[in-house]
Amino acid sequence: MAGLRLIVGLGNPGSEHARTRHNAGFHFVEALAEKAGARWNVDSKLFGETAKVEIAGQTVWLLKPATFMNLSGKSVTAAQRFWKIEPEETLLAHDELDLAPGVARLKFDGGHGGQNGLRDTIRLLGHGKFHRLRVGIGHPGHKDRVVGWVLGRPSKDDEVLISRAIDDAIDVLPLAVQGDFSEAMKRLHTPK
């Protein structure tokens, strides 16, 4: 399988959203950029902010859509077209209600599971054949509380767990960039 050339963090722009659960995808790519010493640049033609990093000896583009979550696909598909990157060479990092804080999972293909950034990307691509990093944020317990939950800040304990899951995902990312997703999944999904 081809490696990764584009990693997108899904989230909402603006300081009021910066520390929310819904921005777990942004937190992931921001941590990657910080680790690599990369700087973010506004790129209006791609409807977001971009950074270039080197992982496992390969150039990888990072993207934070500035379109708000529900319209993320516009930015994702613009970047894929501009850099001539296939969906299969793309990873979307996003918050995941169905995983507990502290858990991160890699996945390829599938539906959107109610995640609006994935929903819009799938709508514009016409399929879901791209990689995902699902960063667990937990569930509030009842579907009527989901919107407030994802747009709210996690507790200090959950914030630590989410950061730990992001670090764990960063540790296996070189394998995914090189195309060894099965080993990356095995290492990320095996409890320590």
UniProtKB/Swiss-Prot annotation:
UniProt-listed GO biological process terms: protein quality control for misfolded or incompletely synthesized proteins; rescue of stalled ribosome
Keyword tRNA-binding: yes
Single GO term (MF): tRNA binding
Active-site residues (renumbered): H22 (proton acceptor)
SUPFAM superfamilies: Peptidyl-tRNA hydrolase-like
InterPro entries named in the record: Pept_tRNA_hydro, Pept_tRNA_hydro_CS, Pept_tRNA_hydro_sf
Sites annotated Discriminates between blocked and unblocked aminoacyl-tRNA: N12
Marked site (Stabilizes the basic form of H active site to accept a proton) residue numbers: D95
Keywords: Cytoplasm, Hydrolase, RNA-binding, tRNA-binding
Recorded catalytic activity of this chain's protein: an N-acyl-L-alpha-aminoacyl-tRNA + H2O = an N-acyl-L-amino acid + a tRNA + H(+)
One cellular-component annotation, GO: cytoplasm
Main location group: cytoplasm
Superkingdom: Bacteria
Location relative to the cell: Cytoplasm
One Pfam family this sequence matches: Pept_tRNA_hydro
Class of this enzyme: hydrolase
Binding site for tRNA: H17, F68, N70, N116
EC number: 3.1.1.29
Stated family: Belongs to the PTH family.
Role according to the record: Hydrolyzes ribosome-free peptidyl-tRNAs (with 1 or more amino acids incorporated), which drop off the ribosome during protein synthesis, or as a result of ribosome stalling.
Assembly and interaction partners: Monomer.
Name of the protein this chain belongs to: Peptidyl-tRNA hydrolase
Native source organism of the sequence: Stenotrophomonas maltophilia (strain R551-3)
Designated gene of the protein: pth
